[in-house]
Amino acid sequence: MGPRRVIDAGAMLLVFAAGTLGGAMNALAGGGTFATLPALIAIGLPANIANATSNVALLPGAAASAHGYRDELAPLGGVDWRVLAAITFVAGLAGSILLVLTPTRAFDLIIPWLLLIALIAMLGGKRAADWLAARVTIGPRSLLAVQALLGVYGGYFGGGVGLMMTALYGLLAGIGVRAMFAPRTMMLAVANSAAALVFVATGMVRWPAALPMIAGAILGGWGGALIGRALPPLLVRWWTLAVTGATTAVFFARAYG
């Protein structure tokens, strides 16, 4: 089915609800893409168009979060955060251009594997980082190289990249989870912004779907921040894993079933 330029009331309600859920998930633990992407595909958008539209829809929430952490930004692993941001922006541009050049059918086959990578990062990223940190010493150059790869991934797809940053920053920069909130949030916003520029310029965003999703994501981000103060962290984690696991299974069945 080709992408719809106009969506009906039911589809609009669906993408608004998905945006609300995605915004809340991002505010709580990340993984909002796993709520927004399936909804956009369900209303008839090709996977690559849905991915681009989802990126733009979730960007205001990411930007607002980054702005909120601006006073906490500091060097990460001995590297100025501005240098990391510049690398992330260029890498995000490269990743998003790669998506634009990827045929729709090819992306249909690739995306389940990207989702699986994100799921693995959620399940074992922190443990793997702790295991490596006890055995290897990694310096600023490795951090720059890894940040470039994360930027490309964030521009191309982005699902789970925040969780990957959480795990890898702990390994490469040797900082705790709380200290990495500010740089991680900023790098996510930078990668998303770079990708959004490319997606908008190349006409990959379906605005009739993006606009209600943006509204939902803003509402969900606000509500998620409030709810997050009351929910046990373990419950948030298992909910995120459940949504991600179910989404991954559906996309594998869709691509290879």
Predicted regions and their residues:
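Small-residue-rich segments of transmembrane alpha-helices in multi-pass membrane proteins
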Residues: 42, 47, 85-93, 118, ...
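Transmembrane helix exit motif
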Residues: 63-74, 96, 104, 113-138, ...
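Alpha-helical transmembrane segments of multipass membrane proteins
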Residues: 20-24, 39, 66, 93-97, ...
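Residues within membrane-spanning alpha-helices of integral membrane proteins
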Residues: 12, 55, 111-115, 119, ...
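Membrane-interface alpha-helices at helix entry/exit sites of multi-pass transporters
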Residues: 45-55, 77-83, 174-185
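Structural signature of hydrophobic alpha-helical transmembrane segments
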Residues: 11, 45-60, 107-115, 152-159, ...
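Selected transmembrane alpha-helices and immediately adjacent juxtamembrane segments
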Residues: 2-46, 132-181, 188, 211
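Selective hydrophobic functional segments
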Residues: 53-106, 192-235, 239-242
